[in-house]
Every structure is written in structure tokens, then in C-alpha cells.
């Protein structure tokens, strides 16, 4: 039997650990840490995600404000709102919900949001600190993967790890976090010619390729740890599936994350943790 790495359970633990930190912050500074979310347009899925983030904030005692902008919002108008949030001392974390309407530049957003308030840890400034080994916060999804490994006491030090995917959101920061945990890391991508050969040598494989059901049993060695970051609505019967053919892992992998219920729940939990951490850092050092 493959051990199911339950991200919902780990996320619950992370949220519970934040409750006393939020309460202490309130007691000390007279307000709760605040996450401000900016959403542009009427994408239904995005609005559901934003609503879930607000609910998650409120459940642990944080506050969340949602800035809902019409689809025709100009780049200048969006930039003005982000600048205002950057300069608002009552705002600790800023999150811009992607995707943006096509006429808006995500590049501009990633340049403009202050690293000191970047709750996602994905702006260019934030990633600069991160890759220099001086992170203000870590990108949410890779940090969530590390929390899962920690929760289940899965050893990383000295292990061979492969990360499939090289995005700034998951792949590259994931490789760095594993390296800092003293794993020997190989980063694979769409141009890797011998990917299956490499993944079959790994003790731990993190798959963030963005391609549904890309890897299966034949791509992993016996008793490997498999972390599936992918999420797609193209599974059998329209069900959610990941980048890994999960049903093939039973009796082969030692442990694996399911989709849904694996890495996904960790992303919001780490967003809350990042916001709390940024609030604490800003409160300790007003010049931060």
C-alpha cells in the first residue's frame, strides 16, 4: 500500500499553528495581520479561489480585503491600486489573483508589488532575495511541499531528488529548497531527453510539469516518494487529476500525494503563513 500524503491534514496543522501567532500579533499591535487580494474581471474560478482565501484568513483571525476591479481596468489603474497597497501600513500581504485579462501585464505586477508585502513570494524582487539565500518568504507551493515532507518525517538530506518542471512558481524554487535541505537535485524539463531514466534513479520526485498524467509507474523506482503538484480537469469523467497516473503507484511507490487533496490545500495554508510572517517582520522593523 502506498502511503497517502494528506495535504488537507498538513494544511490544517499549519493553520492551527498560526492561530496563537495571529492572537499575539493582535494583542501586541492592536490589529490582525491583513492580506489584500486584487482580482480583475469576472473569471468564476478566480473568484472562488479568492473567496476561499478570504474565508481561510478569517478562520484563523486574520483579516482579508478583496479589491474587485472590472475587466476593463487599465494597467495604469491597476498600478495605482498596487502602489497604494504598498504604502498602506495596515496591509501586510498583497496577492494579485492570476490570470489577468489579456490587456494587462503580469510582468508589471511582478515588478511593482513590494517584496516586503509579497504574500505569494513570486515577485521578481522576492525571488531575487529567495535565490540569493535571503528569503523574506518562500513561494507558497514549494514551501507547502517541504511542509508535507516534514510532517511525514520523510528524510531529504543525502537523497537523490528530481524536480520535473522549471517554472519560477514551482520548479526552480522547489529545486533550491531541496538543495538547501541537502538533497542532490536534478531539474528536468520539456527538453530533457532522458527524463524517465533520471526519475527512475530518484528517491524523491516532485512533478510540476503542467501536463496531465504525464508520468506513471514505469517512471519511478520501487519505493520512491512521489509529489504531484499538477492539477487538471481532464481526468476520467472530467475528474481532477495530476501530472502523475496516481492509480499506478499503489504497491510501487512508498508514498505519494493524491490529486486533489495533496499539494493543493497547502498553497493557501502557506499563503496565510507568509502573510503572518511578513506582518511580524514589518512590525519588528518599521523600515522593513
Curated annotation (Swiss-Prot):
Extract the CDD domains matched here: NAD_bind_m-THF_DH_Cyclohyd
**Pfam families xref list:** THF_DHG_CYH (PF00763), THF_DHG_CYH_C (PF02882)
For whether the record's keyword set contains NADP, the answer is yes
Residues recorded as binding NADP(+), renumbered to this chain, are 165-167, 190
Enzyme Commission number: 1.5.1.5, 3.5.4.9
Q: Name one GO molecular function term.
A: methylenetetrahydrofolate dehydrogenase (NADP+) activity
Q: Which GO terms describe its biological process?
A: L-histidine biosynthetic process; methionine biosynthetic process; purine nucleotide biosynthetic process; tetrahydrofolate interconversion
- Name the InterPro entries for this protein: Aminoacid_DH-like_N_sf (IPR046346), NAD(P)-bd_dom_sf (IPR036291), THF_DH/CycHdrlase (IPR000672), THF_DH/CycHdrlase_cat_dom (IPR020630), THF_DH/CycHdrlase_CS (IPR020867), THF_DH/CycHdrlase_NAD-bd_dom (IPR020631)
Record's keyword terms, sorted: Amino-acid biosynthesis, Histidine biosynthesis, Hydrolase, Methionine biosynthesis, Multifunctional enzyme, NADP, One-carbon metabolism, Oxidoreductase, Purine biosynthesis
> Which cellular component appears as one GO term in the record?
cytosol
Subunit (UniProt): Homodimer.
Family to which this protein belongs: Belongs to the tetrahydrofolate dehydrogenase/cyclohydrolase family.
Summarizing the function annotation, the protein's role is: Catalyzes the oxidation of 5,10-methylenetetrahydrofolate to 5,10-methenyltetrahydrofolate and then the hydrolysis of 5,10-methenyltetrahydrofolate to 10-formyltetrahydrofolate.
> What is the designated name of this protein?
Bifunctional protein FolD
Gene that produces this protein: folD
Amino acid at each position: 500500500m502506498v502511503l497517502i500524503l494528506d495535504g488537507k491534514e498538513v494544511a490544517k496543522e499549519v493553520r492551527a499553528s498560526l492561530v496563537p501567532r495571529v492572537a499575539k500579533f493582535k494583542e501586541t499591535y492592536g490589529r490582525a495581520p491583513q492580506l489584500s487580494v486584487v482580482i480583475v474581471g469576472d473569471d468564476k474560478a478566480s473568484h472562488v479561489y479568492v473567496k476561499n482565501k478570504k474565508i481561510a484568513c478569517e478562520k484563523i483571525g486574520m483579516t482579508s480585503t478583496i479589491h474587485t476591479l472590472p475587466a476593463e481596468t487599465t494597467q495604469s489603474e491597476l498600478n495605482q491600486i498596487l502602489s497604494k497597497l504598498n504604502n498602506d501600513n495596515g496591509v501586510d500581504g498583497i496577492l494579485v489573483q492570476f490570470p489577468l485579462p489579456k490587456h494587462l501585464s503580469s510582468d508589471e505586477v511582478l515588478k511593482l508589488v513590494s517584496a516586503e508585502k509579497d504574500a505569494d513570494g513570486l515577485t521578481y524582487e522576492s525571488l531575487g532575495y529567495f535565490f540569493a539565500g535571503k528569503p523574506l518568504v518562500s513561494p507558497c507551493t514549494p514551501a507547502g511541499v517541504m511542509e508535507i515532507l516534514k510532517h511525514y518525517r520523510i528524510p531529504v538530506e543525502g537523497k537523490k531528488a528530481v524536480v520535473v518542471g522549471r517554472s519560477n512558481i514551482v520548479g526552480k524554487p522547489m529545486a533550491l529548497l531541496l538543495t538547501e535541505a541537502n538533497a542532490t537535485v536534478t531539474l528536468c524539463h520539456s527538453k530533457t531527453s532522458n527524463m524517465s531514466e533520471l526519475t527512475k534513479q530518484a528517491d524523491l520526485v516532485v512533478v510540476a510539469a503542467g501536463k496531465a498524467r504525464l508520468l506513471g509507474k514505469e517512471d519511478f523506482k520501487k519505493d520512491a516518494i512521489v509529489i504531484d503538484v499538477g492539477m487538471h480537469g481532464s481526468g476520467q469523467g472530467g475528474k481532477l487529476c495530476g501530472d502523475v497516473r496516481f492509480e499506478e503507484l499503489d504497491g510501487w511507490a512508498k508514498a505519494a500525494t493524491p490529486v486533489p487533496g495533496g499539494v493543493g490545500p497547502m498553497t493557501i495554508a502557506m499563503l496565510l503563513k507568509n502573510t503572518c510572517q511578513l506582518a511580524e517582520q514589518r512590525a519588528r522593523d518599521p523600515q522593513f
